[in-house]
Design a protein with these regions (language model features):
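Oxidoreductase cofactor-interface core, primarily capturing Rossmann-like NAD(P)-dependent enzymes
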Residues: 2-42, 52-64, 73-82, 86-95, ...
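A hydrophobic C-terminal alpha-helical subdomain
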Residues: 223-289
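Conserved SAM-binding strand-loop segment of SAM-dependent methyltransferases
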Residues: 45-48
Length: 289
């Protein structure tokens, strides 16, 4: 049995589907069981709980031998993951795959990336069979620009000349499924990226082609993005963290391209052009999801 935390998120929903296709028994650990059942289908067992509550997590891990660990971003991320690992150890879970960040490290600009680094250290010292997936920034994040693309034909962000090999969450899920179900990945840290490092202008050009109308990248000041995030209701720590992540991109620190998707999942990663084509209806309608 495989327990998937974050099962209704960008990666989790694709991961559960891929595991079901592989013939695995899958249990989804979620906050909203009704919504999860509708999204994930009848083949997935749904268990309600809170990853920050050891009692509900312990119940969900009964009979589980593999765990996909994705804690929600928060200032308590490292503490939550450490607690989950202890519950997993007591429950007899034998393999853990941790969802981490491409910029994870003790000196990262992003506080969440620093917390992921701390979580990686705890996992590595746990004695459990583990693999760490440092996923690049998602192509799906561009759906956040849906309204500005639909209304003004613009992507506004302070990316400067930075590049990133954005990854489709479908590809990260495919890698996670392979690592959870196949041997040979113990102790590995995989940086999971798309096939090309793109600038804001590159992304805009591919979106223009998919939408058959002009989309341009506008390099704005961080203060503009900060104000927008505040208006959208993001807590202050999240605003600061998102700006730190964008600054990491702008500084050229997440532009590496790896072959992990092809090597581990056994197929080429999706290009941004392919993502743009299937995202085009949402972007044209100004809908973020």
């Amino acid at each position: 049995m495989i327990l998937v935390t974050g099962a209704t998120g960008k990666t989790g929903r694709h991961l559960t589907g891929e595991l079901v296709r592989r013939g695995e028994r899958v249990r989804a650990f979620v906050r909203n069981p009704a919504a999860a059942a509708a999204a994930l289908g009848p083949e997935v067992e749904i268990v309600a709980g809170d990853i920050d509550r050891a009692d509900t997590l312990a119940a969900a891990m009964s009979g589980v031998d593999r765990l996909y660990l994705l804690a929600p971003p928060s200032p308590g991320l490292a503490r939550v993951e450490a607690g989950a690992l202890e519950v997993a150890r007591r429950a007899g879970v034998r393999r853990i795959v941790k969802h981490s960040a491409i910029d994870a490290g003790p000196a990262a600009r992003s506080s969440i990336a620093r917390l992921h680094a701390a979580g990686e250290q705890v996992l590595a010292a746990s004695g459990l069979d583990y693999t760490i997936l440092r996923g690049s920034m998602f192509m799906q994040n561009f759906l956040l620009f849906a309204e500005s693309i639909a209304v003004a034909g613009e992507i506004r962000a302070p990316m400067r000349n930075g590049r990133c090999a954005f990854v489709d969450c479908v590809d990260l899920a495919a890698v996670a499924a392979a690592v959870l179900t196949e041997d040979g990945h113990h102790g590995r840290t995989y940086v999971v990226t798309g096939p090309e490092a793109l600038s804001g202008e590159d992304a805009a050009a591919r979106l223009s082609a998919a939408l058959a109308r002009p989309v341009r990248y506008v390099d704005c000041m961080p203060e503009e993005t900060r104000a927008l995030l505040r208006v959208q209701g993001s807590p202050e720590w999240m605003v600061a963290d998102m700006l730190a992540s964008i600054e990491t991109l702008a500084a050229g620190e997440v532009d590496q391209v790896t072959d992990v998707v092809e090597r581990v999942a056994g197929r080429p990663p999706r290009t941004f052009a392919v993502f743009a084509r299937y995202a085009a209806p949402l972007l044209a309608a100004g809908a973020p999801s």
